[in-house]
C-alpha cells in the first residue's frame, strides 16, 4: 500500500509525510521491538543466574540498550530509564520478536510481488490459503521467505536504508 501511495503522492510534502510515516513504522516495529526482546532476554537471563531484578538494575539494562540501539546521535535522558515499566508487552514473555520477524517477512513478500518475481503472487496466495495447516515458518517458505536465515531481515534493513535515502532527497530537494 505504501508503495502505491508514494507513487500517487501529489506533492513533495505528501511524499515526505508518507515516507516519514513508513520509516516510523519500521523503527517502531523492527528496531524497537527487537530492543524490547533483547531487554526481556537480558532480564530473564539475569533472573536465571539468581541475580535480583531490581528497578535499578532493569533501568540500567534498558538505558544501555537505548544507548546501544540509538547511538551517539540521540541523547538518552534519565526519563527513558523507566519506560520499560509501562510496556505491557512484557506481561506475556517472549513474543515481541514476532513483530520484527513478521514485519521483515511482510517486506520480503511485498518486495517479491512488487518486483514481479515469477511465482511470488501465487506463493503468497498459497501462504494465505494455508491457514494453520503448517507451522508459520514453513508457510512463509511457500512464498519464498526463509525466516531460518538472516536474508529477510537483511533485505528489510536494506529497504529501510533505501527509504531513508529517498526521504533525504525528498526533504532536501525540490523534486
Where are these regions (language model features)?
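C-terminal, non-catalytic "cap/extension" segments appended to globular domains
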Residues: 1-13, 37, 43-175
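Hydrophobic transmembrane alpha-helical segments of multi-pass transport and channel proteins
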Residues: 26-31, 93
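Short beta-alpha connecting loops at secondary-structure transitions
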Residues: 18-25
Amino acid at each position: 500500500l505504501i508503495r502505491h501511495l508514494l507513487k500517487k503522492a501529489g506533492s513533495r510534502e505528501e511524499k515526505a509525510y508518507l515516507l516519514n510515516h513508513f520509516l516510523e513504522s519500521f523503527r517502531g516495529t523492527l528496531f524497537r521491538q527487537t530492543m524490547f526482546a533483547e531487554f526481556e532476554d537480558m532480564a530473564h537471563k539475569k533472573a536465571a543466574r539468581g541475580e535480583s531484578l531490581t528497578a535499578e538494575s532493569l533501568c540500567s539494562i534498558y538505558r544501555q540498550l537505548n544507548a546501544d540501539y540509538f547511538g551517539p546521535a540521540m541523547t538518552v535522558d534519565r526519563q527513558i530509564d523507566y519506560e520499560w515499566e509501562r510496556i505491557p508487552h512484557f506481561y506475556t514473555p517472549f513474543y515481541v520478536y514476532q513483530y520484527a520477524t513478521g514485519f521483515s517477512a511482510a517486506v520480503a513478500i511485498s518486495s517479491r510481488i512488487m518486483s514481479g518475481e515469477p511465482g511470488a503472487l501465487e506463493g503468497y496466495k498459497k501462504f494465505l490459503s494455508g491457514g494453520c495447516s503448517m507451522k508459520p515458518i514453513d508457510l512463509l517458505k511457500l512464498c519464498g521467505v526463509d525466516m531460518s536465515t538472516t536474508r529477510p531481515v537483511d533485505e528489510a534493513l536494506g529497504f529501510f536504508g533505501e527509504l531513508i535515502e529517498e526521504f533525504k532527497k525528498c526533504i532536501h530537494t525540490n523534486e
